[in-house]
């Protein structure tokens, strides 16, 4: 009996110590969060935006991921330095002052300038990645499927009625068994002056995509439509977060892996695609080569 009492006493002491340590850690985390919030509130608007962007879920995945070359998770020295400077909006000195399009060349301009085709490449690489991931869990995955023609259906005024309208990806059985799910990708730059907050950035682009395609997909294709809105800094809109959560769940079940590991892998893949695209927009040549 004495031995049992001693054992129970030791267990209680361990639990007490553990609970105390957890309480202290929780208090410290809360203190740091409150301190960070105060700093953010008192910072200039531009700094507030940088801090908000840097703290978004998924925006720092490339910093914490293992540098696995076979997964494409490695960066060379200049790429890493550029990535850190982009993340914190630090000055980058060795870039042109004027873009080939004639505008002043800044980081913000580099992310949206269509000369050189980097904006289209960024979109297509994300589209292809999402299609690749959907192929793991869906049947009949198509890239750029053509939508069926409109034949008398009543659509909202903003719908895309073009006879050759396409969306980025179609897969069967994602949200519901045997039902077609359509997805359309958009990448936006969150530092545009017209945006007031990150929530507004995502809402604007998601609503625009839904206005163009949601009713047509629902009424004619009898499918579901999900806009996948990303930012150049690695963030995602609510619809995109919900989609990736479902994707990770399905992939984890299919591969027999745990959800957290699968989600981390998916986030890392999307994070590095966005990061490499941003680095290409910053450093890539926008001059068209002349035939020899």
Describe these PLM feature segments:
Residues 143-149, 223-234:
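Acidic carboxylate-rich catalytic motifs and surrounding loops in phosphoryl-/glycosyl-chemistry enzymes
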Residues 1-88:
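Extended C-terminal regions of large enzymes
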Residues 74-106, 129, 133-193, 202-208, ...:
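Active-site metal-binding core of divalent-cation-utilizing nuclease and nuclease-like domains
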Residues 116, 197-201:
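Short glycine-enriched, charge-decorated loop/helix-capping segments at active-site entrances
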Residues 216-222:
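Arginine/glycine-rich "motif VI" loop of SF2 helicases in the C-terminal RecA-like domain
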Residues 229-292:
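Domain-level recognition of nuclease-like catalytic cores that cleave nucleotide substrates
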Residues 96-126:
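Short Cys/His-based metal-binding microdomains
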Residues 1, 188-191, 233-236:
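Short acidic, S/G/P-rich loop/turn micro-motifs used as interaction or catalytic elements
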